[in-house]
């Protein structure tokens, strides 16, 4: 075999290996671009330590208990000091608990580049994903268990707003059981007179 033939042979072999590595990397997601505006802050799945209410949970994060506040949504109150249990609050809390429990009791947490890392109560602000990739924040809005929360910046605002509009039109969840009042700043609120309705 001449030197030229040997060189062509090795080049062909290297190209074949490179193609194989690239194909494997594509399959494993090595070259996938991250979702625009969103980064994974805690890779892996975290076990639920406690369900606080519909939009707040605590997780065991490598031996540390962290409270997680769902980004971009707000569920009716069940445990807020000096606030009565609001219409559909218990239903929203039960939906979050039952959905996560049915999925194995573990979640993946994703931060948002437009959002702060923690809120004023030192809770981590996160999108909460089920193991199958379902965004639970969005599902709560779609199913009428939560309001879209427009008061702070986050990348999925338009998606959540559209989900809320569809839930309103279909009278899903709290939109059928309660009578939320539009607030001056683009969101909705529950009047205290509705506190015990629809629980």
Task: Indicate residue ranges for each PLM-predicted region.
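Small beta-barrel nucleic-acid-binding modules, primarily SNase/OB-fold domains
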Residues: 1-199
């Amino acid at each position: 075999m001449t030197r030229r033939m040997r060189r062509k042979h090795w080049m062909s072999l290297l190209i074949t290996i490179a193609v194989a590595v690239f194909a494997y990397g594509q399959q494993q997601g090595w070259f996938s671009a991250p979702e625009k505006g969103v980064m994974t802050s805690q890779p892996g799945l975290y076990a639920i330590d406690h369900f606080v209410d519909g939009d707040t949970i605590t997780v065991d994060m490598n031996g540390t208990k962290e409270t997680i506040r769902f980004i971009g949504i707000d569920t009716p109150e069940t445990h807020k000091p000096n606030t009565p249990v609001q219409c559909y609050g218990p239903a929203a809390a039960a939906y979050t608990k039952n959905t996560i429990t049915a999925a194995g009791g573990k979640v993946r947490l994703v931060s948002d580049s437009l959002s702060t890392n923690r809120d004023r109560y030192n809770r981590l602000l996160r999108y909460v994903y089920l193991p199958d990739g379902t965004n639970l924040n969005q599902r709560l809005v779609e199913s009428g268990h939560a309001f879209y929360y427009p008061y702070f910046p986050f990348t999925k605002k338009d998606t959540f707003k559209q989900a809320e509009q569809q839930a309103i039109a279909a009278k899903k969840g709290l939109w059928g059981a309660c009578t939320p009042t539009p607030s001056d700043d683009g969101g909705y609120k529950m009047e205290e007179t509705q506190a015990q309705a629809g629980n």
